[in-house]
Amino acid sequence: MKHTRRNVLKGASVLAAAAATGGIAVPQAEANKQPYPKGMAHGLTLLTMRRNSSEDYRLGVKTEKGILDVAAAAKLLRIYAPETMDDLLQREHGPALNTLVATALTAAAAKPAFVKEETVEYGPLVSRPAKIVCVGLNYRKHAQETGAQVPKEPVLFNKYQTCLNRHNGTVKLPVDLAKKFDYEVEMVIVIGKEASNVPEADALTYAAGYATGNDFTARDLQYETGGQWMIGKAIDQFAPLGPYMLTADLVDPDNLKLECRVNGETRQSSSTADMIANTRHMISYISRYIKLKPGDIIFTGTPEGVIQGKPKDKQVWLKPGDKIACSLEKLGELKFELV
Ligand code: MG
């Protein structure tokens, strides 16, 4: 058949019709054009897998049958599903993912798409958010331990995509630039739909899910570079995140225990119930000034127990070889090593 424009268009519409009935695998470029229903995924524990230690990232779902490799299942079942966490969030293809998972759990054909979690190499939970917004001094005792005023409204700063890091990864300490490296366990909000000037009462409906994160920090750069925070917190690899995102329907974000351990020793132990600005206030407040987009993430502040909060003669800063473990109740334990 001659590849006239008309034939190509006709071919695309046949593909779309077949896809709508679940009859054919749809390439991503084609899927972008499909009228898939928009919405967030529900009832799922999600992760990013990486293959061959490369930036070949794929969406995974933790199930009772193991980790479902979403792209592999979509191919086996010949139905569309978003292939990466960023595709899921930014295209708002939650319903397609829920359909795929429900089908895969009962279809014999999808069996090869389940893998053992022990064999999975984790990638950064998200890899291309449009924004990473961070809230500082959001726990009273942490504000007090650092000698700061307890803020009346959330104190905002930012990180960048190049900060993103993964569960079981490493943070390379830039020892030529800084010496005072510190941990900050934090709950991370993952945004699921566009939020602009949203009222507090509705704010939680804009969250796709929640994850464990660490707002890793070089204190000397944070406090000794002219009174601005970003440079101490936006260094490459300084935003470990993961291993999982739990969908928002599974989590009460304002009532989660959180902990940080260094080489097995507990350093931080608190609850998100102690946050000054709760989750709905943070989303609402940020959305007054900055339009939040699906796939954006928000670091929500750390509780007391950081090295900066100790008396000066007891401050032993982190060093290469230290192993950090951060956990949030239900959301999983994030581990990484300093090199
Ligand atoms: Mg922080």
Go through each PLM region and give its residues.
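Secretory targeting signals
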Residues: 1-3
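N-terminal non-catalytic cap/leader segment that marks the start of a structured domain
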Residues: 5, 12, 28-154, 323
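N-terminal export leaders
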Residues: 5-21
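A generic local secondary-structure boundary/capping motif
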Residues: 34-37, 47-49, 122-124, 144-147, ...
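Catalytic-pocket segment enriched in acidic/His residues
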Residues: 34-36, 217-339
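Short, structured patches in soluble enzyme cores that scaffold and shape functional sites
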Residues: 50, 137, 159-161, 168, ...
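Short acidic-glycine loop/turn motifs at beta-strand connectors
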Residues: 61-66, 191-193, 263-264, 328-330
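Structural signature of FAD isoalloxazine-binding scaffolds in flavoprotein oxidoreductases
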Residues: 148-167, 183, 320-329
